[in-house]
Regions:
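Sequence/structural signature of beta-propeller domains
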Residues: 1-181
Length: 181
């Protein structure tokens, strides 16, 4: 390669309302794109609408720890990633223990607590036990599945699905569309 690799440079710095930001997701809406951020100190999700011309609304905070049935103490989240569907669901993921919490932001309630496990005999058997080498990125997939980026040992994209379901693999048809849950 004789050409230099293109670089990205900071073109704008946007102050975030969460402590120790660790995950970002985008939800497409009729009004524009909504950027969602989560930090690894609290369960507060910051949300900001980006208008069609790039104008930013004020950040709003949704404190997931105030939802009925929220299983974690306030101020102890250790979230590594956030995902959003095309409706009102957000999912936040912890690395240790490996769990995804799914919340509906309208109306505000906890929808699911999903334990990410590696069944005996699976490709991940024996490789998912390292608490410092689990999920770092998260995407909703169709069919109740999740795509997780594993940090190391091995570096991989992992498909998690409902118990008993066979892995489907990944294609562009698996990604949720705008307004799709």
């Amino acid at each position: 390669m004789s050409e230099k690799t293109p670089r990205l440079v900071r073109s704008e710095l946007i102050d975030l309302p969460v402590v120790e930001a660790s995950g970002v997701a985008v939800r497409q809406t009729e009004r524009g794109a909504v950027v969602l951020v989560i930090g690894d100190r609290t369960a507060e999700v910051g949300a900001c609408l980006i208008g069609a011309r790039g104008e930013l609304d004020d950040w709003t905070l949704i404190d997931l720890a105030t939802l009925p049935g929220w299983p974690l103490p306030s101020g102890d989240s250790q979230f590594e990633a956030i995902a959003a569907d095309g409706g009102s669901l957000v999912a936040v993921m912890r690395e240790d223990p490996p769990v995804v919490l799914v919340a509906d932001t309208e109306p505000r309630h906890l929808r699911a607590e999903i334990r990410l496990t590696a069944p005996a005999g699976s490709v991940l058997d024996g490789q998912w036990g390292d608490a410092s080498s689990r999920g770092e990125g998260l995407v909703f997939l169709r069919g109740g599945r999740l795509l997780v980026a594993q940090e190391k040992r091995p570096r991989a994209l992992i498909e998690f699905g409902p118990v008993g379901a066979e892995p489907k693999g990944l294609s562009s048809d698996d990604l949720l569309g705008p307004e799709e849950s």
